[in-house]
Amino acid sequence: MEIKRHFGVYAVCFENGKLLCIEKTRGPYQHRYDLPGGSQRLGEGLTETLTREVMEETGYTVRSYSNPRIYDVFVREELKNFMVHHVMALYDVEMDEDAPQVTISKAVSDGINDSLGYIWMDIQEITEENASPLVLKVKSELLGFPELDKTFYMNWKVNDEKPTSS
């Protein structure tokens, strides 16, 4: 089976039991909660990617970042003959509360924005049905059970619509 690699840089902002997430609109994580972040541009450093992606997807300015770490997951969508090895660099971030929040644009400089906006998700409401593998990794970490080894999702379901809350 073919394995494609994807590398991205993502923000972990956890306050008062809630995780800052974005609502994905396309791709394998569509209609799921995901972390703010994404792919690097040519010549861009990790923290430059981090701050740019957070601004584009949430409108927030990152004040500080710390605790860099890397996780990975293997995702094979239902009925696909390839798997994606998603490698993620994560940083804990604090937002600059004094900076004005920028309006999120549907179109960003590198194409169409793939998020509907941001949401503060209660960590207890995050499930495999409503979240991306990235968010699930972070949830485990925040609950004190970090999954340091690779995780496999062999029949990943791409949601056609947003899951309903129970």
Annotate each PLM feature.
Residues 1-19, 65, 88-92:
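Conserved N-terminal beta-strand and adjoining loop/helix that marks the start
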Residues 12, 33, 119:
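Residues that recognize and position ribonucleotide moieties
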Residues 18-56:
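Conserved Nudix-box catalytic region and its N-terminal flanking loop in Nudix hydrolases
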Residues 21, 69, 119-122:
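Structural signal for conserved beta-strand scaffold positions within catalytic alpha/beta enzyme cores
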Residues 40-63, 74-131:
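Unchanged
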Residues 68-74:
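Generic short beta-strand segments
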Residues 108-166:
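Nudix hydrolase/Nudix homology domain
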